[in-house]
């Protein structure tokens, strides 16, 4: 469009110069074309300036946002987390363990630098994800209530049904050692627990003694899954 206007303006200018006695209409057309050309160029220049200022503003806003986020993460406290006991893949844990927010950055949270989902962590000489800190001093009643909730709200229907009905039947009568063992079992992936209970996958070495020894917690869980009494089961209330 701009090239067409320039060409037309030049033609009118040449015609006006070679024909001084040309009609007034031709002269007015040339003036209109030149005015359009100058207006178009002015608009393009102003548009470039506006785009440049917008880009500068966007860049400044992004840098301010990053600085604000960095300052916020660098001063994260435990009482500001969305969950006082975050799960391994909680967004809070992911943020606290990102490259820019490691423990070397001076974070005040006890969760910084702790990768709860790491398979390299060990617990009681068992190669398993690290336990969520802060649960060592739980009262027995609090632990039982938490475990009942965890068995009902894991997210996999098959595993939820097996674990929650087992918890309703046995959890309150378990000794503290087996209660802690059941707590550690819930740290394992849902489908792994389901396949171990249904004997569709080999039991790993860390749980072999519990699942293969009669009377142990894992062995009783397999018997509960087998449901020899053919009982009708449904999700218990919380």
UniProtKB/Swiss-Prot annotation:
GO cellular component term of the entry, any: mitochondrial matrix
Compartment(s): Mitochondrion matrix
Keywords carried by this UniProt record: Chaperone, Mitochondrion
Gene3D superfamilies, per the entry: Flavinator of succinate dehydrogenase
Pfam families from the UniProt entry: Sdh5
Quaternary state and interactors: Interacts with the flavoprotein subunit within the SDH catalytic dimer.
Note: This protein may be expected to contain an N-terminal transit peptide but none has been predicted.
Function, as annotated: Plays an essential role in the assembly of succinate dehydrogenase (SDH), an enzyme complex (also referred to as respiratory complex II) that is a component of both the tricarboxylic acid (TCA) cycle and the mitochondrial electron transport chain, and which couples the oxidation of succinate to fumarate with the reduction of ubiquinone (coenzyme Q) to ubiquinol. Required for flavinylation (covalent attachment of FAD) of the flavoprotein subunit of the SDH catalytic dimer.
Protein name as catalogued: Succinate dehydrogenase assembly factor 2, mitochondrial
Organism: Mycosarcoma maydis
High-level lineage: Eukaryota, Fungi, Dikarya, Basidiomycota, Ustilaginomycotina
């Amino acid at each position: 469009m701009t090239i067409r206007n320039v060409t037309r303006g030049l033609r009118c200018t040449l015609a006006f110069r070679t024909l001084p006695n040309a009609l007034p209409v031709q002269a007015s057309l040339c003036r209109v074309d030149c005015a359009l050309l100058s207006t178009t160029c002015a608009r393009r220049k102003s548009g470039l300036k506006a785009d440049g200022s917008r880009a500068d503003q966007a860049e400044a806003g992004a840098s301010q946002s990053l600085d604000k986020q960095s300052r916020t993460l660098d001063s994260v406290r435990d009482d500001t987390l969305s969950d006082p006991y975050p799960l391994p893949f909680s967004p809070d844990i992911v943020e606290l363990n990102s490259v820019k927010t490691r423990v070397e950055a001076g974070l005040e949270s006890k969760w910084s630098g702790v990768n709860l989902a790491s398979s390299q962590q060990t617990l009681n000489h068992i190669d398993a994800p690290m336990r969520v800190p802060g649960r060592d001093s739980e009262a027995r009643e609090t632990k039982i209530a938490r475990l009942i909730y965890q068995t009902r709200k894991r997210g996999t229907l098959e595993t939820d049904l097996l674990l929650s009905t087992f918890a309703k039947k046995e959890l309150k009568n378990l000794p503290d050692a087996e209660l802690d063992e059941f707590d550690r079992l819930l740290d394992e992936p849902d489908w792994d627990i389901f396949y171990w209970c249904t004997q569709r996958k080999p039991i790993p070495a860390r749980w072999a003694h519990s699942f293969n020894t009669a009377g142990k917690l894992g062995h009783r869980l397999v018997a509960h899954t087998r449901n020899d009494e053919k009982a009708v089961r449904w999700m218990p209330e919380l």
